[in-house]
């Protein structure tokens, strides 16, 4: 099992997912690992990081999504230590496009923050 948590947040409308993503990266030392359109006007963002950092970031993202005019927070989940099978199948891994941000969040690199 992974030592890093996964957080997933889904909204109805683009502005609340954008606000949530921004709030999450500002609130916790996390990395956004994927963003997707989940259906008609529904969007999801997935984050990774230490359990406590993901919880802090998700709290900020939930509040930001709830407070965005015209948008709706649909659902969210935090999985503290996802099983490796989940990581192998779902788009929640650290791809090369987010490596600099992961290193910065973990304090081991000089990525942008």
Swiss-Prot record:
CDD domains per record: BMC_CcmK
Nucleotidyltransferase is among the record's keywords: no
Subcellular location as annotated: Carboxysome
Positions of the BMC domain: 5-91
Biotechnology: Heterologous expression of 12 carboxysomal genes in E.coli (ccaA, ccmK2, ccmK3, ccmK4, ccmL, ccmM, ccmN, ccmO, ccmP, rbcL, rbcS, rbcX) leads to the formation of bodies that resemble carboxysomes, have densely packed paracrystalline arrays and RuBisCO activity. These structures open the door to generating carboxysomes in plant cells to increase their photosynthesis and productivity, as well as tailoring bacterial microcompartments to specific metabolic needs and molecule delivery. The absence of ccaA, ccmK3, ccmK4, ccmP and rbcX leads to less active RuBisCO.
Effect of residue 40 to D: Does not complement its deletion mutant, forms homohexamers in vitro
Keyword Acyltransferase: no
Keywords associated with the record: Bacterial microcompartment, Carbon dioxide fixation, Carboxysome, Photosynthesis
Described function: One of the shell proteins of the carboxysome, a polyhedral inclusion where RuBisCO (ribulose bisphosphate carboxylase, rbcL-rbcS) is sequestered. Assembles into hexamers which make sheets that form the facets of the polyhedral carboxysome. The hexamer central pore probably regulates metabolite flux.
The record's note on its domains: The tight homohexamer forms a pore with an opening of about 5 Angstroms in diameter and is positively charged.
Family membership: Belongs to the bacterial microcompartments protein family. CcmK subfamily.
Quaternary state and interactors: Homohexamer. Interacts stably with CcmK3, probably forms heterohexamers with a 1:2 CcmK3:CcmK4 stoichiometry.
Name of the protein described by the UniProt record: Carboxysome shell protein CcmK4
Species in which this protein is naturally found: Synechococcus elongatus (strain ATCC 33912 / PCC 7942 / FACHB-805)
């Amino acid at each position: 099992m992974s030592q890093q948590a996964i957080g997933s947040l889904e909204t109805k409308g683009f502005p609340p997912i954008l606000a949530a993503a921004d709030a999450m990266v500002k609130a916790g030392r996390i990395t956004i690992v994927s963003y997707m359109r989940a259906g008609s006007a529904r969007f999801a963002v997935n984050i990774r990081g230490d359990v406590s950092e993901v919880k802090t970031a998700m709290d900020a993202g939930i509040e930001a999504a709830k407070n965005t005019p015209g948008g709706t927070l649909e659902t969210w989940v935090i999985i503290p230590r996802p099983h490796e099978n989940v990581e192998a199948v779902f788009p929640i891994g650290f791809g090369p496009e987010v490596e600099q941000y992961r290193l910065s969040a973990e304090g081991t690199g000089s990525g942008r923050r």
